[in-house]
Amino acid sequence: MGSMTIREKRKMLEKMKALAKEKDICVLATVSGGNPYCSLMAYATDDDCREIYMVTNKETRKYRNLIENPSVSLLIDTREEHVGSKRPQAKALTVTGLFQIIDKESKKALVRAKLLEKHPHLAEFLDQADAELFCIKVTSFLLLNGLTEAHFEAV
């Protein structure tokens, strides 16, 4: 595909953000000691999709990996809507970013509310002493549209 105009790039970035906001489950990829580790995670985003919010237990490998190496990758996709012969039309959005603990109480309340809005089943988990709210500060989006059409946007 040829180069895109600024307007087309902006429109594509908005499509990527819309997909991230529409979905609520992702695969979080972390690395520790050169070994990759994937976790299925519930998430919510801020309004502009610059931050992706999650919660985890502090006593997990995932959390230790995040502390050791804050660079992460997320996979958000449409495979559930594209089954059988529609599989080639599936979209896969790879989000890269940096892990950051949320420590301000005012922000914790906001993030908690956003997570509960999308995931009411997390209420009990969020109340546990070892539950840690965190965000991924988005650095880029890579959208694979079908099998061959790819779009990358740094943010």
Regions found by a protein language model. Give the residues of each.
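Proline-centered flexible-loop/turn and helix-kink motifs
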Residues: 68-70, 120
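Residues in well-ordered beta-strands of folded domains
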Residues: 29, 44, 55, 75-77, ...
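Short helix-to-loop capping/linker segments positioned immediately adjacent to catalytic or ligand/cofactor-binding
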Residues: 15, 27-28, 82-84, 120-128
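Alpha-helix boundary recognition
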Residues: 20-21, 67, 116
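Charged, gly/pro-rich active-site loop segments
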Residues: 2-8, 87-155
